[in-house]
From Swiss-Prot:
This is BRO1 domain-containing protein BROX. Residues 375-404 have a biased composition (Basic and acidic residues). The modification N6-acetyllysine is found at residue 283. Residues 372-411 are annotated as: Disordered. It is found in: Nucleus membrane. Nuclear envelope-associated factor that is involved in the nuclear envelope ruptures during interphase (NERDI) repair, where it is locally recruited by CHMP5 and reduces cytoskeletal stress through its action on SYN2 to help reseal the ruptured membrane. One of its GO terms (biological process) is mitotic nuclear membrane reassembly. Residues 409-411 form a propeptide. Belongs to the BROX family. InterPro entries: BRO1_dom (IPR004328), BRO1_sf (IPR038499), BROX (IPR038898). Residues 90-408 form the BRO1 domain. Changing residue 204 to A: Does not affect SYN2 interaction. Does not induce SYN2 ubiquitination. Does not affect recruitment to sites of rupture. Impairs NE repair.
């Protein structure tokens, strides 16, 4: 289902040469610097390469991160940091703040920023794959897995590496914990969307589908709440998307809960549940329009134009009409004024992030190699200020053309 998921832009970064004239005193140190430069450039290239797959991304990321670890961790695995942690200035933009970059003289800042982009790549890969016209079951599983991997990376960055930063992120920057938490939750919610679509296709019990939809709506509500204190200028569009998805899946929950109530001969309550679904679906449609008119980072997706979205509208309408007919012929039950409380708990299909760890330090790092970096030889005028050649150019992301919508993005 092309463009069903909202995506913020990739982070952009200034080139890094890893040239330390005078400091590097041996061939092994020189080789590490060359390998860092080339592996970083290769990883950045893959972010916008449409032929890149998860295996290629993992190999390229592991190659760079294992080398970068030597700038962060001591070789004896003690808690002491590497003497090289603060040797290089790194400069990155943020997904919500346009092309206004942040810079820190800290390899941990680089590790988190690049890791963040790797997680974003997995979300964009999942979105592209979900947009294929005739997606196979294996591809659907890969969409599901990619979103869980992304959630795991974001979670690991937030819990294990953000606390290590010397300079905490400013409000609304990517490395602020609230922002990363919103990405974690969104990835979980979108992975559960795949589960729901699969459950609908396989005609699982309405009670299970209702519970999954309700849990997914709660995820979207939680992500939206996490962003509530950010400036609307850069968060409004993303929040509209989260809000419309919350309304959409709450409508799904009420629709399938209505089917469950009807099966239990509670026709009056079923009608009220479906009326609530109808109201929420209309609200989701209105929010789709508002989302399309809201300015902000990322390309505008069009959920209301998708068959998967429209199918729910037809399902609500037909099921409500069926319940009203049954009530007029058989049950004659009073329709409650209040919508039923959704106290649904899914026992199956809930998404947890796939645990993530950065690779261990490359075997190229030895005590002798580390000793070949002599910090006493740093030039006197070596300053933390970004050099003129470190201009941060926006990432040119490939356009993804919508394909014919089959309405079945996980079959």
């Amino acid at each position: 289902m092309t463009h069903w998921f909202h995506r913020n832009p990739l982070k952009a970064t200034a080139p890094v040469s890893f040239n330390y004239y005078g400091v590097v005193t041996g061939p092994s140190a020189s080789k590490i610097c060359n390998d860092l430069r080339s592996s970083r450039a290769r990883l950045l290239e893959l972010f916008t390469d449409l032929s890149c797959n998860p295996e290629m991304m993992k190999n390229a990321a592991d190659s760079y991160f294992s080398l970068l670890q030597g700038f962060i961790n001591s070789l004896d695995e003690s808690t002491q940091e590497s003497k090289l942690r603060y040797i290089q200035n790194f400069k990155w933009t943020d997904t919500l703040q346009g092309q206004v970059p942040s810079a820190q003289q800290d390899a941990v800042f680089e590790l988190i920023s690049m890791g963040f982009n790797v997680a974003l790549w997995y979300t964009k890969y999942a979105s592209r794959l979900a947009g294929k016209e005739n997606i196979t079951e294996d591809e659907a599983k890969e969409v599901h897995r990619s979103l869980k991997i992304a959630a795991g990376i974001f979670k690991h960055l937030k819990e294990s590496h953000l606390p290590k930063l010397i300079t905490p992120a400013e409000k609304g920057r990517d490395l602020e914990s609230r922002l990363i938490e919103a990405y974690v939750i969104q990835c979980q919610a979108e992975a559960q969307e795949v589960t729901i679509a699969r459950a609908i296709e396989l005609k699982h019990a309405p009670g299970l589908i209702a519970a999954l939809a309700y849990e997914t709506a709660n995820f979207y509500q939680k992500a939206d709440h996490t962003l509530s204190s950010l400036e609307p200028a850069y968060s409004a569009k993303w929040r509209k998307y989260l809000h419309l998805k919350m309304c959409f899946y709450t409508a799904y929950a009420y629709c399938y809960h209505g089917e469950t109530l009807l099966a239990s001969d509670k026709c009056g309550e079923a009608i009220r549940s479906l009326q609530e679904a109808e109201k929420l679906y209309a609200k989701a449609e209105a929010l789709c329009k508002e989302y399309g008119e809201t300015k902000g980072p990322g390309p505008t997706v069009k959920p209301s134009g998708h068959l998967f979205f429209r199918k729910l509208g037809n399902l609500v309408k037909n099921t409500l009409e069926k319940c009203q007919r049954e009530n007029g012929f058989i049950y004659f039950q009073k329709i409650p004024t209040e919508a039923p409380q959704l106290e649904l708990k899914a026992n199956y299909g809930l998404v947890e992030p796939i645990p993530f760890e950065f690779p261990p330090t490359s075997v190229q790092w030895t005590p002798e190699t580390l000793a070949a970096f002599d910090l006493t030889k740093r030039p006197k005028d070596d300053s933390t200020k970004p050099k003129p050649e470190e201009e941060v150019k926006p990432v040119k992301e490939p356009d993804i053309k919508p394909q014919k919508d089959t309405g079945c993005y996980i079959s």
